[in-house]
């Protein structure tokens, strides 16, 4: 039977619970931070060997720590390494104290008898290290990220310390998925003793009633991904990397398997829906940008005629070439620059803001001109009535003209003249006119 962990998960206890304690950087240490609301954050991970019910995952970082339990020195009252420290504490008269002092001295040798009586929390310096008492185990190295649960789902709430003075200063972040602990390490933990009164800690356990939530909210948080892992970590195959898909995210289907989603442990209400919506095709014509992989898409892509950021020579966004769509120093810059043919502010010959070649406002909300550019538009485009910018058969986004001849960024000699030929093209099942150089840009369509 379990001896009850500090926290319970949906009414269930586990063999052990690991706490990763952090304090706010505004405070020097945990002892000082514990006196301030939100001064401490504790990441809690349950430990169990019950593979059938919980399917716990191996946590190599925790194993690195737990495997040193066997290195702890088993002491007797006369020979243990903390004997001198304990004698010094006994001479302070702590054992005769009552109330808060008694609760502190039974759990901690660092009781501060000289602290002001007005602040009981100062009397119990639980987080200060005892001096001259044993040697620390050194050269224990691991990646702190590996301490986290293999499945990034957590429950978080505001609470307090689980040891005196139990200050209400902790932000708890409790992992929903437990980690595995071996039977041998459970045995080692059950044999741990208090170094002051030489009592086996496991004899007391944590069989205490849970605190009332006191109208505090408990939030369930699902993180989409962890920070990038080192290449050598991925080679280990420790369970966490195995859950990732090709784009380094966790798929919903990978969170739980049949063994872990036991009906007596999780209700269906705790599951969450698949939120990988395929919305690209649904929003190509409603004013949104889509990410696409084809030639004539209105979103970001790597093709020739895409309406987003392009890898070609004539970019509509920021680029490293001469034909940029925003700020640039090239000849055919689309934004602010020193080039000749700009569609924004500049010193060029054909500005669309200052009576350029047949410029005017269009219903699409951009300013345009005939031969050169009409806002963030291509040759001879008129504006659509929507919020998108587009031309011809291509889709709405920031677009280029017909793969080359009439793209933004082409020289003047390659562009069509103001009196260029008219043509009609079908777009979204209806005819639209595309603006000509001498037409006003406030027509719903435009001629070329």
Swiss-Prot record:
- Region of interest called Disordered, as start-end residue ranges on this chain: 229-448
**InterPro entries in the record:** CA_dom, CA_dom_sf, Carbonic_anhydrase_a-class
Specify the Alpha-carbonic anhydrase domain's residue ranges.
Answer: 1-222
User: Which Pfam families has this protein been placed in?
Assistant: Carb_anhydrase
Reactions this protein catalyses: hydrogencarbonate + H(+) = CO2 + H2O
Sequence ranges of Basic and acidic residues compositional bias: 281-334, 342-354, 370-379, 386-421, 436-448
Where do the annotations place Zn(2+) binding? 19
Comp. bias regions, Gly residues: 357-368
Tissue distribution = Component of the acid-insoluble and acid-soluble organic matrix of calcified layers of the shell (at protein level).
EC numbers for this chain? 4.2.1.1
Where is this chain's protein located in or outside the cell?
Secreted
Q: Does the keyword Lyase apply?
A: yes
Primary location recorded for the protein, binned into one broad class = secreted
| UniProt feature, compositional bias: Acidic residues | 245-280
Family from the record: Belongs to the alpha-carbonic anhydrase family.
Q: Which PANTHER family match?
A: CARBONIC ANHYDRASE
**Protein name as it appears in the record:** Putative carbonic anhydrase 2
Native source organism of the sequence: Lottia gigantea
